[in-house]
Every structure is written in C-alpha cells, then in structure tokens.
Amino acid sequence: IYDIYFKNLKTGKVISQTISNSTGSVAWANDNKTVFYTSKNQTTLLGEKIWRHKVGEKSDDKLMYHEKDDTFYNGVYKSKSGKFIIIYHSSTLISDYQILNADNPDGTFKRFTPRDFNHEYSIDHFDDKFYIITNWKAENNRLMETSDQKTSISNWKEVISHRKDVHLLSMEIFTNHLVISERKNGLRELRIINQGSGEDSYIDFGEDTYTSWISVNEEFNTNLLRYTFSSLTTPFSTYDYNMDTKKLDLKKRDEVVGGYDSNKYASERMYATARDGKTIPISLVYRKDKKLNQPQNLLLYAYGAYGSTIDPYFSSVRLSLLDRGFIYAIAHVRGGQIYGRQSYDDGKVLNKKNTFFDFIDAGKHLIQEEYTISEKLYAQGGSAGGLLIGAVVNYEPLMWKGAIAAVPFVDAVTTMADPTIPLTSGEWDEWGDPREKKYYDYMLSYSPYDQITNTEYPNMLVTSGFFDSQVQYWEPLKYVAKLRDSWQGYNKLYLHMNMEAGHSGKSGRFRRYKEYALEYAFLLDLGGIKK
C-alpha cells in the first residue's frame, strides 16, 4: 500500500495534501495539477477505484470508475505520447481499457472497445493512431492499428499477422522504426522493423539461453533503442542499439559485489521429452571447473502458472551455490508460455497435471543424461510453484533428495471452493471452480494437501509469511501438520513461519537475503557441504 505525496519542484516544499491507500498507480493530466490514481479495497487489497485529484484544491476527489468485479486488477497510466490518460482492467482472460484526452482532465473516460470474454490485448499511442497487440482471432497475438477517434474493434486494421510459431509479446513505437518483442523457440527476441522500407532484422545476443526486453524509451524521434539483456552467466545489462547502423553501446551492467568472472561459468539449453511427447526446454548454469564427469548436486526450479514464463536470468545470489558445485536448472514447464499460448492452455484448469509431469520428466532427463542422481537432485518452487513442489513430491517422493516449497498454494480445493477468501474468484479461470464437480474431482486428484499419504517423503523446507494475503499462512501450516502425521522414515521436515513477511518476503532492501540464506543452508546441509 502506497501513500502519494506532492512536492513543488520550484520551492522544494512538500505540499500538505497526502493520498493514502493507493496502489502506486498514478497519471498526471497535461494541466500539471490534475492527477488520477488508484485506491485499494481494504479487504482484498485489489486496486478497484480510479479517482481524480486536484493538487492544491480542498474539494473532495472525484470517483471516476469503480470496478465491482473482483476478478479484475485495475490501474491508470499515461500514454507515451502524452495525449491520453488510460485506465486498464485485467483478469486472467480479459483485458479492457478506458481512455481520456489528457488535455481535458474534467472529461469523461471512454471505453476503448467493449469488454469481451477471452479477449486480451494491450494498447499504445503514436501520432493519431493506437497500436494494439491482441489475441482476437490470433492465439499467439497479432498487431493491429486504429484511429484514436475510432477505437472499437470493428475499426482495427492488421499490421503484423498471427504466426503459429511466434508469440508476440510487446512493442515500442518510434517515428521511423517499430520494435517488436516476441518469443520464438522459447527465447525472447527483439525484431526491428524499418517503418519506411518495411525491412526487418533481429538483434544477435550471442548466447544460447538468455532473456531480453524493451527498456524505457521516452522519445519517438530517435534511432536508438534501449533494451535490457541478461542470461544465466551475464548480469543485467542495459544497451542502446542504433537501429540504423546496428551498433551496440553498453550503458550499464549490474555490478557483482566481490568480483565476478563470467568465463568461469557456462550455461546450456537442453530439451527433455514429456510423457505425452511434448518438448520441455531446460536452462542450466554451472561453474566450469566444478562440473566433473560425474553426477553433481542439482537444484531444479519451476513455476508453471498464469502464463508466466520463467526466463533464464542472472542472479548473483545463485553464485553461492554454483561456487560450491551445484548445477542450477530451470524447467520451462507448461503453464507458462514458453512455446506460446498453447503452452499455457496445456498447463491450466483440466490440464494442470501436465505442469507436474513436465517437471518430473525434466528431472528424469537430467538423471538420464548423468548431470545428477536422485540422491543429489533438489526441487524448488514458490506460490503456485509451491503447489508444483507439493504435487511432485506426492507423485515421486523418492526422486528428490530435498524440496523447497516457498509460500506454497497447497490446499487448492478448500481455497478455490471458498469465494469469501480474497482473490479466490479471480483464480477460477486458472484452476477451475470446484463448486462444479468436474473441476472438484480433477483438482482433488492433484491437490498436495489432499494427496498426502503415509510414505517416505524427501527432506523438505516449507516457508510462509504471516501477512501473506495471497497464500494465507494457515495453508502451509495445515499442510505441514498433515505431513508430520503421515511422515515415514528419517528425512527432515522444516517449517519456517516468517512473522514479519508477506507473499514476497520481508520488506527492505537486504532482508530478503536472509531468506535466501535459509534456503541455501538447507541445501548445503543436505549436500554435505560445510563451507
């Protein structure tokens, strides 16, 4: 929850007016005195109301919009062109926008196009047109445009057509160029299109497994594209790319305290075959002098929900494991969108078990390829990825030396069946509504809490936050309690309840490192690594 303050930049004085209970979503109108902001629902903590505030005036703020459907997230921003204030509404399967001329802050917001089930899109403005990335009749999205005076869907015209093997993600508009961020073969690429000639090219990143994205580009009339690049061995790096000469200029690279030599580390992209024949990409990183011709300790991570793709990025924290001989691997399982929208649809609702089976099959592939063995294989996931961990240790309890389930969503049926729990109704498109029998039966068949049996589980660390509003603290607690009642053998089961943390851990710049240290201490102890 944010408080909004206003400061006079000429005098340096902070104005006494303060706005509380905000999401932090703010947009200035062009009169430099009107601001639009989003307030939170005190129970669900969702942004649900958009207000207009006049800086320096004592009149009450005016409510511009109230979203009463709690399956939607809402906010407000200003278009890059500076011409429009834009209210956005997004749920699991729906996007919706309202626009207002930023020169007329006292006007009325106009809906961009009628809200439609299963229609997801994003908008940007340049000159006198809106550009739209949409899944309308395009599973992996296409790019369209329309006049800013006629924005309903019947007026949209295609700019870039749908491609079955390419997932169009985002765009950046320039006067002479159009930049498209897209995913092909599971990797994010940046495509540069010359608006005049129509010629296009791609930036060569020079690595096999990486991630990249368009950074902040405030100007239209420039030939420089600013983007960010990272890989499992390359720290986050900001570049300016000349779209005419194709020359790169490194502007900044994150410093690794204590020194870092990327030449000591190697990354790979390998592919496992799922039990249904689908391909599962796996990204790995290890220290070259530690990866000997014998199985190593290996930490396998995945998330696999909400269409969120876990790209291979650099982590200085991870070096602590790599320098001690661990291999770190990301299984790009279904439930994310590694191969486009179909990957997501194949890992949600009544296809959710594909997420778990992909993770298990990725682990078995790593064993088969002799990167590790079960006695050295560890699993990790958090939140919805914690559900993944809870499921895979039920399916294959003897496959793992240890497992970390962070703030895990493990009591799926109970949570999804209770619409009074904040955020539940907004999750039904992802997991299904167990008040319907087909969803209930399927969800019950994999729900980690409900599928606990009297068996020997791997060593486990389960973490939770007392102030977690997304996975309430009692969910991991009851899960661990039931595990203890069913626990066989002599493996260790730890519960860490952080009494100061929410879903994303403790606030503060450095406090999260204590949580990393706890997880790594668990792994190193099991691996017999003492220093």
Where is each model-derived feature located?
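Cap/lid segment of the alpha/beta-hydrolase catalytic domain
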Residues: 1, 13, 241-247, 251-383, ...
